[in-house]
Amino acid sequence: MVARLTRLIILALTLFSLHAQAGLFDSGSSPHFVTVNQAFGFDFSQNNHNVVLRWKVKPGYYLYRQQFSITGTNAVIAGIALPSGQPHEDEFFGKSQIFPQDVQIPVTLKSTLPGATLKISYQGCAAAGFCYPPETREVPLSQVSTTRSEAPATAAATPAPVPEPQSGPAVSRLPFSPLWALLIGIGIAFTPCVLPMYPLISAIILGGRRDVRASRILLLAFVYVQGMGLTYTLMGIVVAAAGLRFQAALQSPVILLSLSAVFILLALSMFGLFSLQLPSSLQTRLTLWSNRQQGGSLSGVFLMGALAGLICSPCTTAPLSAILLYIAQSGNMLAGGGTLYLYALGMGLPLIIVTLFGNKLLPKSGPWMQSVKEGFGFVILALPVFLIDRVAGDLWGMRLWSLLGVAFFGWAFALSLKSPKGWMRVLQIVWLLAALVAARPLQDWAFATPGVTASQEQALPFQNIGTVADLQQQLSQAQGKITMVDLYADWCVACKEFEKYTFTDPQVRQEFSQFRLVQANVTANSAQDNALLTHLNVLGLPTLLFFDANGHEIPDSRVTGYMNASQFLAHLRKLRAE
């Protein structure tokens, strides 16, 4: 009896240990992800003119708000109520909105013709770092009509007015908040070309009188600033509209580099290398028109402010030109007009204070005003660095930001040495430490060993494919090596993380020398891209597949989702050891 019981216990322990080992070692190298239909269950309903589109979002997954696209075929869409999403931010695509829970989108139809459909595109990801290709659904519509006849040509294909559309001319968001323009305007007011003029402008606004009620003084100064703001706002709207018209051209590397050169010239003018201003004849004419206006009257003061916005001094021309070129990059007329209005308001706030309280609150003129002007030269230099970053890539962008930081903190340190005040010694230490920190990327570039630098900057030897036939051809040329197939897309955040962090690791690169590297870019989500994904039974990205020397996929080798360098290196070594 005891012997039989002992055998049963041993058998139970053996079975348990085998199960535990299976649970420990048979798990794949990547998390399990469901199909796109399981992640985002789609449904719809129609009640006459009202269509409701529904998505049931699986926990741990989310849909991108800006990726929704709804168009009608043989249907006129009256409106779409796209709800607000939850704020989301990642390193590569910045701020966006997502739907991590079930979402409904009401669509109102104006009219439909027989055979009308809605074409709906959407895209989502898993929170674990796995993204699905854009999904497209076509919804059949029942026929509805309005009281007035709709032209069939109009109803043939009507795009939905989805907020923040992805198609058509893209309206870029400004990378820096327009509120910075307010601070820049205030700073420009304290440059040597502007601040000394404020008492004179104040006297002109009041018509040479000081026996005016405080409320009237405040109103006159405010109206003057609004006139100036109107001029600048119109400038911003016109330039942003022009930028929207030529948005595609403004994104080309040649144009970006040319604009960067212009920004650098504008910055050099702030450092005193040369002066930028309107032709003297035009300035004289504008000044005469301004002087004809009657000071002390609201209409006259408003016109003086509007004309003052056109009279650019050497201190204001470069910053104004830089801001105008900057907002032209966005093509956003609202942001363009608002940015220039805030800039004018910033310049006008000190003027309102001087007009209301007199010169007592003004700081004394001195060399410090030239330092303010030079400081704005560094602000303008940040714009070409931002533009070149988009052309040269992250590595050179970081070096340029480092160079700008070293230059600014070095300038501030040299400036602080001129002051005899004791507390400036503390500030000198701060500037010096900041310059040392900012110089780190330059130090890494200058003093890194040549082998490491070349390894980091050299592109990986990927063989690019686009079709199933291309894949078969590459697998037939394996030459006894394991073939890694990397499926990449620009809309895949984790793909970019692989590219930036994992594939750049020196040990991973060294291990790659034992593999044949193949890559398919499926960003376009074309028919041949979908055929390749279907052939490989791929649900989404990132996905990396490994094939043996005979062209067969290695079991349990597929990587879905992001892996850091150490995890991925262990995976590669395990595959080679088998």
Curated annotation (Swiss-Prot):
Single GO molecular function: electron transfer activity
Enzyme Commission number(s) from the entry: 1.8.1.8
Segments forming domain Thioredoxin: 436-577
SUPFAM superfamilies with a match to the protein in the record: Thiol:disulfide interchange protein DsbD, N-terminal domain (DsbD-alpha) (SSF74863), Thioredoxin-like (SSF52833)
A single Gene Ontology CC term: plasma membrane
Catalytic activity: [protein]-dithiol + NAD(+) = [protein]-disulfide + NADH + H(+); [protein]-dithiol + NADP(+) = [protein]-disulfide + NADPH + H(+)
Catalytic class of the enzyme: oxidoreductase
CDD domains assigned: DsbDgamma
Reported function: Required to facilitate the formation of correct disulfide bonds in some periplasmic proteins and for the assembly of the periplasmic c-type cytochromes. Acts by transferring electrons from cytoplasmic thioredoxin to the periplasm. This transfer involves a cascade of disulfide bond formation and reduction steps.
Protein name: Thiol:disulfide interchange protein DsbD
Species for this entry: Tatumella citrea
